Amino acid sequence: MKVKAPGRINIIGEHTDYNDGYVLPFAVNRYVFLSIEGSDRFIFHSENVNETVEMEKIEKLNKWTDYISGVIASFEKRGYRVSPVKISVSSNLPMGAGLSSSAALEVATAYAISEYFSFNVPKLELVKIAREAEVEFVGVRCGIMDQFTSAFGKKDHAIFLDTMTLEYEYVPLRLEGYEINLVDSNVKHELSSSEYNKRRQECEEVLKTLGKKSFREVTKEDLERLSGTLRKRAQHVLEENERVLKSVQALKEGDFETLGKLLFSSHESLRDLYEVSCEETDFIVDYLRGKEGILGARMVGGGFGGGVIVLSKKGAFGKIKEELVESYKKHFGIDLTFHEIESSDGVQKI
């Protein structure tokens, strides 16, 4: 049996998903492909890494297999019996560019196991199983957005998701005359070892200081009670949530000019208040600002490298691509990679 699960790009709402905030992602037309069959032991094969790993029982190896093993462990924790299987994966999702290749692998695994063993697990439960694999097994304290989008994606739509209640709404993504590109800085970050978990701790510290249970209870007035780093982190989360709401409205009205401006201000906030951008992604965003037909850009993903999402009028980005490549190479000695991004449906059998 074969399945595919898409990666995702988040239009706006960065570092809000683990703070009970709003996000606006969509599933992209790049996938993890996975096949599953019975076996006498667990065999995991990755075409991309060109490696096969065998194990008698599920164990943590601190490598790519942990995403698969973690999902199986989550099923078993819930009382499902997963007998040994051979799982083969391949992907056309770029790693580390902010498109959530890990979540796509987890969702593909969860969906394949549920279907193969006829567990008939509801989609939302599969999302929770996939996320639990990353948080508890892999050890990255991610929010739920990535797995949710890979499972619930819908072509030609973004998902306006409230990560606190998991209520969601499909918002039409009509890009006629516009395009979305991803620029990969090719500066790689591994979330586990980066500042990501530190930002989570800082946000928990904010809540502790204010005596609140959730960021949804935090108001602009509360910022006065904070200072220094904690104030900056809280201000980003509050304002980024507002930007998501404005972006949903802009998308519904087909107002891409406003959406673009919101992307630029999101990047500034991620750079100055949340402090998760880096020299390379800042350079890309600054370079694009003010160029003809470029409506907006911001870093995407956890930060410290990765990708930049670019919203532009159709064809405008292509005209300045070469200059950007040369300029970036001159500054950093690194080549850029580009991906034109289209929306996609969520996880499915193939």
Swiss-Prot record:
Enzyme Commission numbers on file: 2.7.1.6
Record lineage: Bacteria, Thermotogati, Thermotogota, Thermotogae, Thermotogales
Entry annotation: catalytic residues: 146
Site (Transition state stabilizer): 8
GO biological process: galactose metabolic process
Pathway(s) where this gene product acts: Carbohydrate metabolism; galactose metabolism
Pfam families per record: GalKase_gal_bdg, GHMP_kinases_C, GHMP_kinases_N
Protein name stated in the entry: Galactokinase
Species of provenance: Thermotoga petrophila (strain ATCC BAA-488 / DSM 13995 / JCM 10881 / RKU-1)
Function: Catalyzes the transfer of the gamma-phosphate of ATP to D-galactose to form alpha-D-galactose-1-phosphate (Gal-1-P).
